Each structure stands twice: as C-alpha cells, then as structure tokens.
C-alpha cells in the first residue's frame, strides 16, 4: 500500500483543509487556552531535552492523525529492525547500527568489537592528552588535524566546537575537508610539524578529497624535516579498509577501525570521533555516548504520542507534504552549536533526499526539505526579514540552551530573550489595524509595510545546559527523526547514491584538464567550454 492510499493520509488531507486557515494567535487567546494550556499539552520531554511544539499549526486531532500515520507506515517495526541489526539499508545489503556504538547492553550487536576499539581509542587519546605521545623531536602534541569529508568531518567538527568549554586547553583541533588547497594551507600556517598529529578519516581510504589532502600533508611533514621513518609519530588512520591505510604508509598499530554497518553521517560515535575524544577526553566522550543512548531509549520506549523523534519527524512531514514547505530552518541560539545546521544539512538531505521507494518505484510526493540555518542572533540580521514578512512559510526549529557554558553570563538573558521573542513574533504577527497604530497619524501608507502575517510555525527545543550528555541526546534526536520521516516516505535513509555520478564524471573532467586536447564529443558544449577555459588558465 502506497503512502497516498493509507487511511491516515486520506484523513490528514481532509483535516488539513479544515484547519489550514486556523490562526495560532486564536488558539493561544485567553478564552481558548484554558488549563491545561496549549503549551502544557504540547511540551514533550525526552532524553534530557524538552520540545515546545505549541507554536506549530497543529491541534490534538492533527497529532492523533499523524501518529496514526506513523503506525500505518510501520515506524515502530522499522525502528525495532534497526536496533536489532536487521538489514535496513537494502540497496547496500547492510544494517545501520550507529545505535550499537552507544549501547550499554552487552548483548547488543557487535558489543565486544565496539568496546575493544573504544578502549584502544581511549588509550591513545590519554597518551596524546598527557604528553606521553610525542612528535618525532620529543615535543608533546599541541595540534590535531582531522582530515576527512562529509561524515568524517561534519560530525567531529560540530561536536568539538560545541564542547570547546570542556576540551583540553593544551591541544588545538583543526579540520580540513575541502580539496581546495586553501583549506589545508590555512591550517598549516597555524601549526608546527613537531607538535602536530594528523588523523586521516576515510571509510575506503580512497576518497579523492581526503587522500589528496593527506598526501599533501605527508609531503609537508617531510619537507619540514620529519624523517619518513618517523611519520608514524604524526599520522593515524580511521578506516574500514586497514590494508589501504597501511599501503598509504601509516603504521598498522596506528589504524583505528570503523565498520560498513555505520554510515558516514552517523559515525561520530565510532573511531571517526577520535579527534573528539582527544579534545574532550575519554570520560566526556563516554558522556556524549550516554546522552545519545538516553535518546535511543526514549525513542524505543516512549509511546508515539509522547515520543520526541517521532513527533518532530511527523510535524516535518505535515509541513512538507501538506503545507508544501520547501525548506526548514534550524536556528540554535548558541554560538557553540554554530556547526549544527551544517551537520544537519548532511544528516537530513543526504539521508532523505531520495525519489525512489524501497520497492524501486518512484514517489509522487515531496521528500526531504532543504535544511539550512545559522546561530541566533546572527540570523536575525540576515534572513529573518524573509521569515517574518516574506510570502514563503519556513518552519523553524529554535534551540535554546538555558544556562551558559561561558563566563559572560550577563549576555545570556539577552540571547534567550531574542530566541523566545522571535518565536512569539512569528506566531502572533501584526495585523493591518495594529500596524496603523504603530505607524501613527498621517502615515497610513506605511502601515502595510509594518504588517506581519504571523502564523509562522516554530518548535523550540530546550536544553538545560550544553554538556556532552545533552549534546549526544540532541544529535540522536535528529538521527531518529530522519528515520521516522524515511519510513513514512518509504525510502532508504542509509544510502547516498546521489553523490556517485558526479564523482565518476569528475575523474573524466580531471583527466581532460591535463590532457593534450579534449574530445568535444565526450561532453556537452557547456562543459567542454568550461574545461577549455580552465585549461588555458591552468597553463598560465
């Protein structure tokens, strides 16, 4: 049975027509918002977090029908299959066991293997942090460069930045992902080879961007005096292909294993997170895992009606498939979470940006929304104008950290006030009559420019304090939200075939850029012209 033919889907279509013009400000009006208040009914705790869903364009019937949709689509069954280690990535014939990486149950899949690798990580991280692991001249390591791309970069970078306040002050962590040499060059300007450790992260150890940067970094070490025989003091590898790591020249003892049953965008919990562990220490890394496990338990045990990942996923479907929203915004009012929107871009769009159903037929409904964002309050001075007064409705996830992780505590009430005020303003709007009063006498023509449509939907996620544990829960919340949506849309969130075609053609174009001549029959006229212009520039 296809999504469009599910009874709950049909019921939601009728329900949408009934409430599509309902006003949030009316639902919050004192005469309508009696105890338990709307905020009380629609605030859901879970995994150490809480979500205020009350400023969404939903009522009790909406949630009831959305939960019915989740049941009819098989969300519970697919969730349980994932945790059990069943094949939930059918196009690659794999399980998706990122949850096993943070499981405490000794009977969880691959528990012994995971525990052994984490113990190896912890031993190494402690040696680097304590100064016992030194560079080739005997100096302690003060710089760690993580070289990877996609899931081998975005997750570790996001977490390391977010938890800077609990990181070692003695070690700086740098991230290089782009094949553009400027990325690596800027980092190399900041580091001393005698005090630098490189972590090369690639599942296959053949990724173009990662290996290009890794080779350039190796050459840099040698050019600055590091004997090739001493490179083992400065290079470690994280991969599912240890033979290729050794072939590159990294000592076999310096190889940390990742597995093909963990997708890249779900891999920060594995040895891919070695840079995180070195920065914050093994004990804090364990807390990060514990927070994710808190959310895993909530996802598995909470009824769907009070289940945070389920409700966030379903509300996203409500806007994407019924209201027709093209994008949704993540606005963390926390500079520590600066890289969370970038991380979620990959998590959401690489997972659910699909058109083929699990049975190989093509969907006739939208799937992943465009995910974007910027920390508050920066976004208010960039794109919030469009959110408030533009004709496009963009659902928003606000993320508010209630207590600061830094010493400048006097800033924090201003930050929180802006977050909460934005959600209120987006919900309330300003009518034309209200705008006339604001404009004042004799300024009738200004009033339309001072109106706000309002009724703009937002969710506010509350985090008591940004700790490794609450961050772990927050990340896992979004991971599971993605699974919920993929299940309803009947797509596979664990593959990413969409990145392959560009890679294949990229190798052809790269060869043409250095060839003596280019066969115009190999490419369309536009691509051929671009290649010819680049060839001319590269010869200068």
From Swiss-Prot:
Give the EC number(s) under which this enzyme is classified.
5.3.1.9
* Any one Gene Ontology cellular component term annotated for this protein: cytosol
Q: What is its main location?
A: cytoplasm
Q: Which domain of life is it from?
A: Bacteria
Q: Which GO terms describe its molecular function?
A: carbohydrate derivative binding; glucose-6-phosphate isomerase activity; monosaccharide binding
For whether the record's keyword set contains Cytoplasm, the answer is: yes
Q: Name one GO biological process term.
A: gluconeogenesis
Q: Which reaction does it catalyse?
A: alpha-D-glucose 6-phosphate = beta-D-fructose 6-phosphate
Protein's pathway: Carbohydrate biosynthesis; gluconeogenesis; Carbohydrate degradation; glycolysis; D-glyceraldehyde 3-phosphate and glycerone phosphate from D-glucose: step 2/4
- A Pfam family for this UniProt protein? PGI
> Which keywords, in A-to-Z order, does the entry hold?
Cytoplasm, Gluconeogenesis, Glycolysis, Isomerase
Indicate where this protein resides in the cell.
Cytoplasm
Query: Catalytic positions?
Result: 350 (proton donor), 381, 503
Tell me which HAMAP family the record gives: G6P_isomerase
Query: What is the role of this chain?
Result: Catalyzes the reversible isomerization of glucose-6-phosphate to fructose-6-phosphate.
NCBIfam families with a match to the protein in the record: PRK00179.1 (NF001211)
Q: Which family does it belong to?
A: Belongs to the GPI family.
Q: Per its record, how is this protein called by name?
A: Glucose-6-phosphate isomerase
Q: What is the lineage of its organism?
A: Bacteria, Pseudomonadati, Pseudomonadota, Betaproteobacteria, Burkholderiales
